[in-house]
Design a protein with these regions (language model features):
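Active-site cavity-forming subdomains of large catalytic enzyme subunits
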Residues: 91-202
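Short N-terminal or domain-adjacent regulatory/targeting segments
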Residues: 9-36
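Long, structured ligand/cofactor-binding scaffold of large enzymes
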Residues: 28-141
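Short, small-residue-biased leader/transition segments that mark boundaries at the very start
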Residues: 2-5
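Histidine (H) residue identity feature
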Residues: 11, 18, 54-55, 79, ...
Length: 202
């Protein structure tokens, strides 16, 4: 890694700066000077991104696995992307997430990365960034959300939304009913469960 390259008398000041600032939360100088690979975990889950929110827990398991295999784990957040919460469009965020990942993967002392994804924005952003940075990478998808139920009928994130919109426009359901019907389509965290790009690319 870049950190190990700069761990030398020829670059003493840079070595000190690189090493010292990573010693304040549990890493040791011996670890950082051991030559062991530094594996990043690009964590895409947050309260703003419920599609990927479970990656906050899964990232800890990834961290444990990296340590078990002899690596040094360093976790960092990805730019948040959530299709339905972002206005005017989440498509712009895909590019921001990509650019942020490229800068992180190329500018920090990282030898490899585990990219946590789960929708049709975080997945391409992560894949493009890994290809651009040209470092070893594993993509971990969180999987789709569960199917929902409403009045005994199975509901899904795409078809039910269009049906609910039509029912509301006709006056067949009121606004709270509109919210309840659409809300039934997202009973758990995970990416959209329809045959759209979130499912096909994950």
């Amino acid at each position: 890694s870049e950190m190990c390259i700069r761990d030398s008398p020829e670059h003493s000041e840079l070595s000190v700066l690189h090493l010292a600032w990573y010693l304040n939360y549990g890493l040791t100088r011996e670890e950082l000077q051991s030559g062991r690979p530094i594996i990043a975990i690009a964590q895409s889950g947050s309260d703003l991104t419920p599609c990927n929110r479970h990656h906050r827990e899964l990232a800890q398991r990834v961290r444990d696995g990296i340590r078990e295999m002899g690596g040094i784990a360093m976790e960092f957040p990805m730019h948040p992307i959530q299709e339905n919460g972002r206005r005017p469009t989440a498509a712009l965020d895909r590019n921001l997430a990509y650019l942020g990942l490229v800068e992180t993967l190329t500018g920090y002392p990282i030898d490899g990365v585990v990219l946590t994804t789960g929708c049709d924005k975080t997945t391409p952003a992560a894949l493009m960034a890994a290809a651009t940075a040209n470092i070893p990478a594993i993509v971990l998808s969180g999987g789709p959300m569960l199917n929902g139920w409403h009045d005994g009928q199975r509901t899904g994130t795409g078809t039910t939304l269009f049906k609910a919109r039509e029912l509301f426009a006709k006056g067949s359901i009121d606004f709270p009913g509109y919210i309840d019907l659409v809300g039934s389509t997202v009973p758990s965290i995970g990416h959209c469960n329809v045959m759209g790009t979130a499912s096909t690319m994950n």
